[in-house]
Amino acid sequence: MKLVAILGGGPAGAFAAERLASAGLRTVLLDEKLAWEKPCGGGLTYKAYDKYPFLLDNDTPKRLVRLTRLAASGAGAAGMRLRQPMVIYSRYELNRMLLQRAERAGAQIEQARVLSLDRAGGRWRLTTKHGALEADFCIVATGARNPLRGVGTKLTAADTMLALGYYVPQEQDHVDIQFLPNLEGYIWVFPRRGHLSVGICGRGEPARQLRTRLEAYMQEKGISWRNATFYSHVLPSLAKPAWSRNRVAGQGWLAVGDAAGLVDPITGEGLYYAIRSGDLASQVVLSEAHPPEEKPHAYRTLLNRDFAADLEFGSALAGRLFRDRCLFASVPQRMVQFMRESPRFNGVVQDLFAGTQGYVGLKARLLRNLHGTLLEIVMNFLFSRLVPGET
């Protein structure tokens, strides 16, 4: 293999470029914008920087946040001090760091939009406004709004959620997560360096309705959007049936990140899965164990074993988590209440935040802890009314 073209310079494409170039493979990355401020909270959990320590140990501006507050309408709020902090970047700074790492590794970085992609004779021909390029293999990292129809996942309206929000010139020291009635999604407030990212993501509601919900919350919390910068973006959020037909690979190409639909269908988190899929794709490209015609199958298998099967399982939970009821209240309401009353349950949520608790094993863990959790809730309920000074 002489040359790999990477179509897109976000976290997935940039990290794949670094891995391939570091291994000595000639790598060209093409992206119209390169580093830019993509609409996103910008948070990386322990799972990401434990796997890739450079995401924490670097000189790029970032915030480390340990305090998180989850709230649900009608249930109040529950605070949580994270055992492992969340690392929050502006997406411009994160993308710039990853692209610089790729360039230092030897990747050729080109600011250009790919206008067409054609395959003939086992090779690819790419055209940009600057000319044409031939490549032996392509990694598709073009994001959720992939303009190249022959490669990458095929998203339908049912397989997306909308995210919108504001960059607000204010400061706070904690993350806020707010669940709202009848919304398959949530509001977030992420503190960044010099500003807040305040946003909402949701499935099945128009942008105007989501924006109204968000601005009502901001007004209630005293967060002004008058001098803030508005943003919006479409996120992949594959429904359960879409996973079996998700198009992540084909002859001569592998898709990564949003272009492969690899986003958590419950939280909307995509950064870790972008970086991880870029890593896995580069492993498959470099592997001599798989001839070119076997690389698509090898990549699908690797994705499923690593995290895609867990995301697929999560897609079946998403609607139930946000809209179902538990003990005469919504699931988010009970979750917030249990967090306040049960250290065991709080520990489960801690691990979900850190990314160390997957969806596949969640039910079994909850059942194992059920007796202790209920006992803690009952004892806290009783003794809060018996111990002087507690309410």
Residue ranges and their predicted role:
Residues 12, 35, 145:
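Conserved Rossmann-like nucleotide-cofactor binding loop
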Residues 5, 18-40:
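Glycine-rich FAD pyrophosphate-binding loop
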Residues 286-391:
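C-terminal helical "tail/cap" subdomain of flavin- and related membrane-associated enzymes
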Residues 2, 25, 137:
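Nucleotide donor/acceptor-binding cores
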Residues 1-12:
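Beta1/beta-strand and adjacent pyrophosphate-binding region of the FAD-binding site
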